[in-house]
Structures are given as C-alpha cells and as structure tokens.
C-alpha cells in the first residue's frame, strides 16, 4: 500500500533536498558523451522508411494498442515534429521534451526504436535496453482523459517505457507502475534525470546549470541564454505554476515542474519575449527579466556531437 500523498511528498522532497545539497557544488556539469559517433538521420530518411509500411499486425506484447493508430502516430510525429504531447494532467512533461529533442536528433532512429518495441516487446537504442514491465505493456494504449494523447498509442507506449526505465530520487517510493501512476511520482522527472536521459541517448554534448531547488547562477540571465541559444539547443526547467495559474501537475510545492525547449529569445526595453516548444506546439511568452529569473531553475545547453574524424 502506498503512503498518503502528503507524506509521500514530504518524504520525497526531504530526501531530494539532501541529494541536491550534496551535489550543489557541481551545479554546472558537462556529461560524458555516448560512445556512438555515427551521424544521425534526417526526417527524409524517416519519411521514406515509414512510407514503405502500409500496415502493422497486432502486437502480442501490447494488447491495448491498435496497430493503425500506432502507425498513424509515428507518421504524425515525423511529418509534424512539433506534435509530441505529454497529455493532460500527467507527469510526462520531461519525456515529451526529450522526445521532441530525439525527433530533431535522430528521427529515423526514433521510428525504428518504437517499431522494435512494438513488434518485439523490447528494444535497444544507444546501448540502452528497454524491457518494459508487463504492467506498462497493458497500460499503453489504454490511458484515458489525457486529451489527444488518448489516441496516440505510440507516445503512450514510449512515455511509459521511459518512465519505467529511467529513475531519479522522485521515483524512489513509487518504482512499479500501477494504474494512474502516469499522474504521480512514478512518472516524475527531476532535473538531473532529464539531463542523464539526454546524455545517454542523444548525440549531444550536455551542459547544465541549476537544479530542482537551486537556481542557476549566470549573472546576466538574458545574455547567458542568448549566448547558449546561438550555439545549440537550450532547454529551460521552469516553475510552470507561476506562469499558468492552473493545476498543471499533482505537485503542490513551489518548485519547477516543466521543461520547455527554447526556440528564440529577444528583449525590448524591460520585456523579454520567449518562443518555445511545449505541449505539442510553439508558445510565445512575454515577461520581465525579474520574472524570468524567478521561474527558471535549470538551463540545459546541448550542442551536436561532431563525428569522429578518424
């Protein structure tokens, strides 16, 4: 039996705070790169590959996934790479942002990975073996009342597999999936876990500043983000409850809960304009420098890994 939500929240964040303080001296990290130095694919590669697939047979591993919807979901994400959507009320935000970056990095690899998972019940990518639990396999395709995610079984499968495989301190007391856990700590993504996913699976150099409680120290925040965006991808870890006055998450504390992938940042007078990916599309937000500083807890900078010249 799981402990009551309030007790679980207090226990998890007490432990999380200890872990964060222990690592506070290493707020800026440069992660080790994956061993694979091959070039990544293009959207054209993925489209050509998918166009050869007219239909899929039902999978014996995923009883609640409809083959036609699964294939359509893959084609939608390749033809409309902004479309990955984490679902209403879930804790899949980090996995949605990660998937958007994976699609930009290796779209063909994404398609082949999800097809292998669907057809064989397990799959390997970047040296990582995904072998989801039977509970996850039953849940995929059966999530309801999550908005358009309801009819996107490939994304349901993928987000559940990511949550099942990657664990952080927020997942300590809830490691095994039960129905409804997509909305709870089982699916949560803390900042270090998100960066670890990028490090292990994508062809990126990853630098990170900040944390789940400790804000990044950058001096001129606008200048720092502008500089990083000029040389690579920038992901911001923000307190979305300050931006949107609504119950976006089950987490009721004043902490960051949301990952956005920045597309553009400009400044006119005392107004900063952000354009970024989240929730399956592009969003524009205007705010003051003080409010920007208030909502940002993490800044992740990703640059494409260069192929080995040898």
Question: What is the role of each PLM region?
Answer:
Residues 1-30:
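Bacterial Sec-dependent N-terminal signal peptides
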Residues 250-257, 266-310:
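Cys-His-centered catalytic/binding microenvironment captured across papain-like cysteine peptidases
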Residues 209-271:
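Active-site-adjacent substructure of cysteine-protease-like catalytic cores
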Residues 93, 100, 240-243, 282:
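Solvent-exposed loop/turn segments at secondary-structure junctions
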Residues 39-174, 228-235:
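Active-site nucleophile-adjacent alpha helix/oxyanion-hole segment immediately C-terminal to the catalytic cysteine
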Residues 148-195, 216, 234-240, 254, ...:
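Non-catalytic membrane-recruitment/adaptor modules and adjacent regulatory linkers
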Residues 28-44:
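Short N-terminal segments immediately surrounding and downstream of signal-peptide cleavage
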Residues 197-209:
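Acidic, glycine-rich loop-and-strand cores that form catalytic or ligand-binding grooves
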């Amino acid at each position: 039996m799981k402990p009551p939500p309030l007790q679980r929240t207090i226990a998890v964040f007490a432990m999380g705070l200890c872990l964060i303080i222990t690592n506070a001296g290493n707020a800026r990290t440069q992660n080790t790169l994956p061993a694979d130095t091959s070039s990544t694919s293009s959207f054209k590669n993925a489209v050509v590959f998918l166009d050869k697939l007219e239909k899929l047979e039902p999978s014996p591993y995923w009883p609640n996934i409809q083959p036609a919807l699964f294939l359509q979901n893959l084609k939608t994400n390749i033809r409309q790479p902004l479309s990955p959507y984490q679902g209403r009320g879930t804790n899949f935000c980090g996995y949605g942002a990660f998937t958007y970056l994976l699609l930009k990095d290796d779209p063909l690899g994404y398609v082949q990975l999800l097809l292998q998972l669907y057809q064989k019940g397990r799959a390997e990518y970047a040296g990582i073996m995904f072998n989801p639990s039977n509970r996850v396999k039953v849940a995929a395709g059966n999530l309801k009342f999550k908005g358009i995610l309801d009819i996107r079984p490939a994304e349901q499968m993928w987000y559940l597999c990511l949550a099942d495989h990657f664990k952080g301190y927020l997942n300590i007391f809830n490691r095994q999936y039960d129905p409804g856990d997509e909305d709870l700590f089982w699916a949560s993504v803390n900042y270090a876990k998100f960066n670890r996913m990028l490090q292990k699976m994508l062809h990126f150099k990853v630098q990170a500043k900040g944390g789940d409680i400790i804000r990044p120290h950058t001096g001129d925040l606008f200048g720092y983000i502008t500089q990083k965006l000029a040389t690579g991808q920038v992901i911001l870890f923000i307190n979305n409850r300050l931006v949107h006055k609504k119950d976006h998450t089950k987490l009721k504390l004043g902490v960051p809960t949301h990952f956005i992938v920045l597309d553009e940042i400009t400044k006119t007078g005392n107004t900063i304009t952000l354009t970024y990916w989240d929730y399956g599309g592009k969003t524009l937000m205007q705010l003051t420098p003080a409010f920007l500083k208030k909502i940002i807890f993490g800044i992740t900078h990703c640059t494409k890994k260069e192929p080995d010249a040898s």
